[in-house]
UniProtKB/Swiss-Prot annotation:
The lineage of its organism: Archaea, Methanobacteriati, Methanobacteriota, Stenosarchaea group, Halobacteria. It is found in: Cytoplasm. PANTHER family: PREFOLDIN SUBUNIT 1, PREFOLDIN SUBUNIT 1-RELATED. GO terms for molecular function: protein folding chaperone; unfolded protein binding. This is Prefoldin subunit beta. It comes from the Archaea. Residues 19-35 have a biased composition (Low complexity). Gene3D superfamilies: 1.10.287.370.
Length: 129
């Protein structure tokens, strides 16, 4: 299929494929950040049920290190805030990639005289909401 395309169209198709790969990477990063965010929020919520005088430990690599309640809570709050920003940034990046994909797909279809089967259908495959 690609061998029959004009060089400009072949270049656009390669750009589409690159964007599709980028979209998949961004979606995977976003999913990982959302999972981490959910876990951190759950841990922060669990701190509400713990006595502030309880002995607490945090994981540092493969070790458990004793820590203070306030320090653990502050660290988790900071992590949650950071992850919320990360997820928001990835959502915006996902939107930009989707827009670029649709624009490029439209250009390719126009270049090929409106042939519907020119590029990958259904967007970059980022999935998710």
């Amino acid at each position: 299929m690609q061998g029959n395309l004009p060089p400009e169209a072949q270049e656009k198709l390669e750009e589409l494929q690159d964007l599709q790969q980028t979209a998949q990477q961004v979606a995977a990063q976003k999913q990982q950040a959302e999972t981490e965010l959910q876990e951190s929020q759950t841990a922060l919520d669990e701190l509400d049920d713990i006595d502030e005088d309880s002995t607490m430990y945090r994981e540092v690599g493969e070790l458990l290190v004793k820590t203070e309640f306030d320090e653990a809570q502050d660290d988790l709050e900071e992590k949650v805030n950071s992850l919320e920003v990360r997820v928001e940034t990835l959502e915006k990046q996902e939107e930009r990639v989707q827009e670029q994909f649709e624009e490029l797909q439209s250009e390719l279809q126009q270049m090929l005289g409106g042939a519907g089967g020119a590029g990958p259908a259904g967007g970059p495959g980022a999935g998710g909401a």
